[in-house]
Amino acid sequence: MNVLGIETTCDETAAAIVTAAEDGRAVIRANEVLSQIAEHAAYGGVVPEIAARAHVEVVDRLIARALQEAGLGFDDLDGIAVAAGPGLIGGVLVGLVTAKTLSLVTRKPLLAVNHLEAHALTARMTDGIAFPYLLLLASGGHTQLVAVKGVGEYVRLGTTIDDAIGEAFDKAAKLLGLAYPGGPEVERAAEGGDPERFALPRPMLGRREPNFSLSGLKTALRIEAERIAPLSGQDVADLCASFQAAVVDVVVDRVRVALRAFGDVAGHPTALVAAGGVAANAALRRALSQLAGEAGLPLVAPPLPLCGDNGAMIAWAGLERLRLGLVDDITAPARPRWPFAEPLATAG
């Protein structure tokens, strides 16, 4: 089975072809990603109108390139998957209209995929892990701890009550005068810094519910930066290292709490999975790997090119749904907001 995946929910335009082999393994035949970082860098963040226009300009070309790289034509496809949300509505519409048009013309099934669900299922594409598993989904706009019980079966154990982890990194970078996107810049600066120089708080540490709160940490960082201004290069490095260490400590503590809660929801997990753009952070990966080892679990984190938004994860999520007969009507809506995990309090 071959599925085309289209991703346009934020500032990456992506198209990919993923094949499900007879033994169930995933083969990524093509994975084209075009980032818009250069277009948004001057604004310090993503400008929705600019993002949507950029998607319009390149999405058709990326689809053609993906098909060419895979050595396939539209007749060889078994389905067309697209991220129908959540995300910036203009970008989501670009991808969805493109996918619907292709579905109508080629008469291939439309698979309207939840972008967050695609992140959640990426580990099955890369490592073939079985359900159930504990997912840490950490990106620029989302931070959740989820019990992944099956395709379409997700129970949210915890979430952020204010800033997402990626959002906090971006705001920290902007505060310290670093470039956009902030996550990689903070991580790079932290490599030369002293993580113990500044005693930044660890919000929510020790709380029974595995929720996150990072706004207080961001405020503490600003206070320290203002206290020692003007900042030298070493000051910035030390602030970044201290900030990153605090975030990692908070995440590890919250994941530990979620692991304890997992058994009551879904039994014994097969793995701890980290997904989303923040999962590319090396310090976080090391800490999560140690935690997983202590719990007797493997840490499964996608290869770095598959941590951020990409078309392969959309294609794979489409394949997972297609194999269960979960196809969508041509009237499937664009959903700028689209929760994918049921809160624990309402889970059956």
Curated annotation (Swiss-Prot):
Protein name (Swiss-Prot/TrEMBL): tRNA N6-adenosine threonylcarbamoyltransferase
Organism listed in the record: Methylobacterium sp. (strain 4-46)
Keyword terms: Acyltransferase, Cytoplasm, Iron, Metal-binding, Transferase, tRNA processing
Subcellular location: Cytoplasm
Note on cofactor: Binds 1 Fe(2+) ion per subunit.
Binding-site list for substrate: 137-141, 170, 183, 281
Binding site for Fe cation: 115, 119, 309
Function as written in the Swiss-Prot or TrEMBL entry: Required for the formation of a threonylcarbamoyl group on adenosine at position 37 (t(6)A37) in tRNAs that read codons beginning with adenine. Is involved in the transfer of the threonylcarbamoyl moiety of threonylcarbamoyl-AMP (TC-AMP) to the N6 group of A37, together with TsaE and TsaB. TsaD likely plays a direct catalytic role in this reaction.
GO terms classed as biological process: tRNA threonylcarbamoyladenosine modification
Chain's gene name: tsaD
Pfam families per UniProt: TsaD
A single GO molecular function term of this UniProt record: iron ion binding
Catalysis: reaction(s): L-threonylcarbamoyladenylate + adenosine(37) in tRNA = N(6)-L-threonylcarbamoyladenosine(37) in tRNA + AMP + H(+)
EC number(s) per entry: 2.3.1.234
